[in-house]
A protein has these predicted regions:
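Terminal peptide-recognition signature
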Residues: 30, 87, 241, 245
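C-terminal subdomain of the subtilisin-like protease fold in secreted/lumenal serine endopeptidases
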Residues: 77-91, 156-157, 247-277
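Extracellular S/T/G-rich loop segment that most often corresponds to the catalytic His/Ser-adjacent loop
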Residues: 2, 138-247
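Active-site core segment of subtilase-fold serine proteases
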Residues: 1-44, 59-62, 66-83, 90, ...
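Hydrophobic pocket-lining residues within nucleotide cofactor-binding pockets
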Residues: 48-49, 163
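Structural detector of well-ordered beta-strand residues that form the stable sheet scaffold
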Residues: 44, 120-122, 158-159, 190
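Substrate-binding/access-modulating region of protease and related hydrolase catalytic domains
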Residues: 49-151, 219-236
Length: 277
């Protein structure tokens, strides 16, 4: 029924609908990308969204605040906290009400503190194929910005859009604009996935000579890998490249100057979309 309580009738929900949730495995997929580009990096993965991809504002702020606290403690005493040199944020939102601006201000202050401590912040630009600034990706002093943010000498905030596999063109879904600093592979990316087996079956099956043959089952990920697209996957590629560029860092952490140098080197090495002009 429409008002069935999932706690009382769990068999009406979940895997029996034959499909996995839209963003199931999002974090696992990102971790796999980081591992591919920076195999020696240590990953601290923190969940902020449910299986439907909705991020609660208070949860995001609380999580980022905890990350900054861990970073600050480690900078004060390397035996405590956690050494966070690059922070990847594969999420985005837009300002819909004046209150959203206040939320972004608080988020900016937290990220500014992390950057002050030498932590590079990498953000996905969004997948809406528009040039409207998304947040937190646009929380920097981009050309023509009216956000009141001034240039500083802290570790950079890097906003990343998605390239097609050819690395010659921007993916059609990727957000664009002067607030997007770099583009990286983000379409048809291969990475790790939870070994999930859904209820949907292959469309066609035709066994021959004792061999089972069938078309791809879109909900069968028992192999542990998947193909996915989005700026959520461009950002961790850049974040991992920056981490690899930093290499082994001092116990006390990375200086903002060293972080900026590493970012500049990585951005310079990324593919550049072909300019029609």
């Amino acid at each position: 029924t429409d008002d069935a309580d999932p706690e009382r009738y769990p068999d009406l929900y979940g895997q029996l609908d034959g499909e996995i949730d839209a963003v199931a495995g999002h974090g696992t997929f990102i971790a796999g990308i980081v591992r591919q580009a920076a195999p020696e990096a240590d990953i601290l993965s923190i969940r902020v969204a449910g299986a439907l991809g909705v991020v609660d504002e208070s949860t995001l702020l609380e999580t980022v605040a905890q990350v900054v606290t861990l970073l600050a403690r480690h900078r004060e005493d390397p035996k405590t906290g956690f050494p966070i040199d690059v922070l990847n944020l594969s999420l985005s939102y837009y300002h819909e009400t004046p209150i959203d601006g206040l939320f972004s201000l608080t988020l900016y202050q937290l990220l500014a503190k992390a950057r002050e401590l030498g932590c590079v912040v990498v953000c996905s630009a969004g997948n809406d194929a528009i040039d409207r600034p998304s947040f937190p990706a646009s929380l920097w002093s981009w050309p023509g910005a009216d956000n009141g943010i001034r240039r500083d000498r802290d570790a950079p905030l890097v906003s990343v859009g998605a390239l097609n596999p050819s690395a010659q063109s921007v993916a059609l879904f990727s957000n664009i604009g002067p607030w997007v600093q770099a583009y990286a592979p983000g379409a048809a990316v291969v990475s790790t996935s939870p070994a999930f087996v859904g209820g949907t079956q292959a469309v066609t099956r035709a066994d021959v000579e004792g061999l089972r043959r069938e078309t791809i089952d879109p909900d069968d990920y028992r192999g542990g890998f998947a193909v996915w697209s989005g700026t959520s996957f461009s950002a961790p590629y850049v974040a991992a490249r920056i981490a690899a560029q930093l290499g082994t860092v001092p116990a006390v952490g990375v200086s903002p100057a060293a972080a900026a140098k590493a970012v500049a080197a990585v951005l310079k090495s990324l593919p550049t979309p072909v300019d029609l002009d």
